[in-house]
UniProtKB/Swiss-Prot annotation:
Organism: Pseudomonas entomophila (strain L48)
Gene coding for it: murC
Record function comment: Cell wall formation.
Compartment(s) where it occurs, according to its Swiss-Prot or TrEMBL record: Cytoplasm
SUPFAM superfamilies (alphabetical): MurCD N-terminal domain, MurD-like peptide ligases, catalytic domain, MurD-like peptide ligases, peptide-binding domain
Organism classification: Bacteria, Pseudomonadati, Pseudomonadota, Gammaproteobacteria, Pseudomonadales
Gene Ontology cellular-component terms listed: cytoplasm
A Pfam family reported for this protein in Swiss-Prot or TrEMBL: Mur_ligase_M
Gene Ontology molecular function, alphabetical: ATP binding; UDP-N-acetylmuramate-L-alanine ligase activity
Family recorded in the similarity comment: Belongs to the MurCDEF family.
The name this protein goes by in its record: UDP-N-acetylmuramate--L-alanine ligase
InterPro entries: Mur-like_cat_sf, Mur_ligase_C, Mur_ligase_C_dom_sf, Mur_ligase_cen, Mur_ligase_N, MurCDEF_pg_biosynth, UDP-N-AcMur_Ala_ligase_MurC
Superkingdom of the organism of origin: Bacteria
Amino acid sequence: MVESQKAMPQPKMGRIRRIHFVGIGGVGMCGIAEVLLNLGYEVSGSDLKASPVTERLESFGAEIFVGHRAENAASADVLVVSSAINPANPEVATALERRIPVVPRAEMLAELMRYRHGVAVAGTHGKTTTTSLLASVFAAGGLDPTFVIGGRLTAAGTNAQLGTSRYLIAEADESDASFLHLQPMVAVVTNIDADHMATYEGDFNKLKKTFVEFLHNLPFYGLAVMCLDDPVVREILPQVKRPTVTYGFSEEADIRAINVRQQGMQTHFTVLRRDCEPLEVSVNMPGNHNVLNALATIAIATDEGISDEAIVQGLSGFQGVGRRFQVYGELPVEGGSVMLVDDYGHHPTEVAAVIKAVRGGWPSRRLVIVYQPHRYSRTRDLYDDFVQVLGDANVLLLMEVYPAGEEPIPGADSRQLCHSIRQRGKLDPIYIERGAELAPLVKPLLRAGDILICQGAGDVGGLAPQLMKSPLFAGAKQEKSK
């Protein structure tokens, strides 16, 4: 705990002392739990299995239960749940029966934000990276923010941290429209794309209106930071009745990038800002999508008065986020090695951005993708887009869809995706049976100099470390921490 934090007004939730998280190991839950622990609250939580995340929280004083049972919630003053938790969960049912409040995670995050200068990052893609860049730049500027991020910040070794300043930087989740609970001082919209459409009853106009509603949670003196390159963000811009700053590659943007040069993992560019000197910037991430994430960060940092030196330092010193084009190391193959990358991208737009980044940074190298679709409903709704974008790999291995609690949907599985991609005639995908070991399947396909990406939001995230430890890749070299 940080001693100087005493000077900062803290959430005082009346009679609430013990806070119980149902699904505490989830990426959106554990960060809030960690901040509350550091604020002195009693925290307990349950999850289906123990993990490094739950072990970390336990080391900080949280009481962790493996499995969901009614008695786990018996002594709680409030339950925090994510949208992934079934209302029939025994802990939730017990809390409702005993009139213990049950609140969504975003409502608890909003309570933390209510006492601070909140910076909320929304958008279909780029939230985690942008939030992480903001935390890095604010720290470089001496502002020591509290942050809650949807991925593990490499430099901090965690996805949440209690800071000593008035700033709280967090992701704003549109997937279940829970970002409407938040009332930040600054809000970013990186882009708006068709995803989680069941929340919006399949109505894209409803999704757009919800983003506008979110921005109108800003006070009249707040700031909306919006990506002008995204056509949907540009479309809703006239509807936003709050002060705005735009960013992008567009010449009309208030903050824009020119002279972009990518050299492997590094991207260099010049930033033009109204009434400011041009700024030369480098980030240790490939791709124009990450330039846009950096521009959003620069827009907010400039508005908050952070010096150019701190902005440059915070961006160049940024060490990345877990599973966002995370380089694990080099796998030995005949004649050389293969660069192994782990990535969370699970939407066609995200897959396309990663492929473009690889082609830009390593134009002569083959791209081998092991991809796992996430949710049958997303695969169905974006089927043609997946066929188009995945067909741009040089070699493609498709794992079966990660269901995330959904029942299979006919025609929306990986076998069908393989068939449709094969029909395009560009490449012949390999279907990976559920539970099959990857190393013996992928090794014969690899050539020296290849880039191998394990991509998706499901259990594909465990494959990169498995490959590094596989006897078939004895002598694999771990990526050194920057």
